[in-house]
Amino acid sequence: MGVGGLWGSDLIAQRPEFFQVMKSPFSDEEVVTVKALRPDWAIIHVQEADQYGNARILGSDFQDVLLSRAAQKTIITTEKLVDTEIFQQEPKLTSVPYFLVAAVVVVPEGAKPGICYPTYTMVDATGMKAYGQAIKEGKLDEYLAQVTEGRA
């Protein structure tokens, strides 16, 4: 896929496995292209999912929908499990269809310290700071154990 904004940057030379300069198929100009990412897994947190893996994102989906399509397998974590009938009544609201999903896990407050509109709409600033500090200090495992204790 062609991308703009990379001319003059070192990214093209530093990461040739991702970027390539080629002649545009539409003009005589050169364009920078980027290799499509194909992750093994995507883990996406949603507001609602059914037992089969149909999932709804009730707010901004950011890149989650694209990730579900790019990944070889997707795990959905959800605030709550709902009846499949809800998806059948309004199929256009299905953000991720079941056939892209390998597993569904119910994880209330699974997006914290971030947000999951409309269930919780404020970023937990203290939680974000603690998360950042844990990464900086190499203590992410300890942090995750602390914030997930008693939730399984």
Residue ranges and their predicted role:
Residues 1-152:
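Conserved alpha/beta enzyme-core scaffold
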